[in-house]
Amino acid sequence: KPQDFKTGEETFASRVANGTGPYTLVKREAEVVSVLRKYPGWWGMREGRFEGNVDEMVYRPIKSDATRMAALASSELDLVLDPPLQDIPRLQADPKMKVVQGAENRVLFLVLDQERDELKYSNVKGRNPLKDLRVRQAIYQAIDIQAIQKQVMRGLSRPTGAMIPTERVSYPELEPRALPFGVAAAKRKLAEAGYPNGFQLRIECPNNRYVNDERICIAIAGMLAKVGIDMKVNAMPRAQFFQKVDNFDLSMHLYGWGGSAVDPGFTLTPVIHSRDGKGRGDFNSGRYRDEALDRLVEQAEVEMDVPRRCAIMLEAFRRVRDNFYFLPLHRQVIPWAMRSKVTVVHRADNTIEPLWVRLD
């Protein structure tokens, strides 16, 4: 039967390794500790693929920021994958510590309900303002992403106008913001759309999924207030948040997409395509429908000529950008904090590769 991620269900493979990897599982207590030990019989050992010198890896989830950083300071831990942003300057100034950082593949963006005829959690009755391109543009232009980068993210973000990491797929023309920040321009677009005094709506945000996720939403709410949009922030733990997303119980929400796969198809098919009940568009929670865009995505799925496929995908992303179906914000710059003796390779999927870890 399918694995139930929402209840934390583990599969047989979670605890019983198949014996072909560089490490074997010695111990696992869910949400407590996992211990991996170097496997001398791994086939890559003979080919020199084991470049690190760590024989045993111990993973300890520690929810409290203070406890986690105290464990690093006392050498109880050698490396922390998610140090609090406010601690980064102090860690960088400490000769006993080291900070390695890089931009994630994941893009954070706003999703707007473009399916309902009447917007939920709003004072607008009988219509949905988010279906109007001018309203979506107004919201986009009201957001000062540079201020979010500086004040909320403490410099650890990379603003983007794209739904994908552009440097990894050679689409640099998508990187700049689609429209410049401008309060006056945003107000004009709202007035043109029939909302000269703005309107009310609500944004759903996780408070423990992305870096400073709740603070991002609060900052955006303050920015939208300047153009007349009264936006309430409804922040919650990610388990509750994703349940609301699954049930479409929202009108606007913060979301992130990315991972180890860098091919644009892994964004186009599940996120950009409309929901067809067959797997495409399963994560298109804004539920817009654009038949021309769907055709481009479907063409890209089967096109074998690489230059032609790249051109099709670029056209699809341009259409998303021009219609403001999503409102891209930034990519997180993820810092890893460690003892100075540790050497690692930072990965854009925010995953540590034990094979490359060295202790000097």
Give the positions of each predicted feature:
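Ligand-site clamp/hinge motif
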Residues: 11-14, 41-90, 133, 230-232
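Bilobed periplasmic-binding protein-like "clamshell/Venus-flytrap" ligand-binding domains
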Residues: 19, 150-153, 192-208, 252-257, ...
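Periplasmic-binding protein-like
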Residues: 87, 124-168, 212-216, 320-325
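Periplasmic binding protein-like
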Residues: 78, 96-99, 216, 222-276, ...
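Short, well-ordered beta-strand elements
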Residues: 21-24, 34-35, 54-61, 108, ...
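Short, solvent-exposed loop/beta-turn-alpha elements that line the ligand-binding surface or hinge
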Residues: 1-20, 44-54, 91-102, 107, ...
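Structural transition elements
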Residues: 22-24, 141, 158-192, 209-215
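Extracellular/periplasmic solute-recognition and catalytic clefts
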Residues: 26-37, 60-122
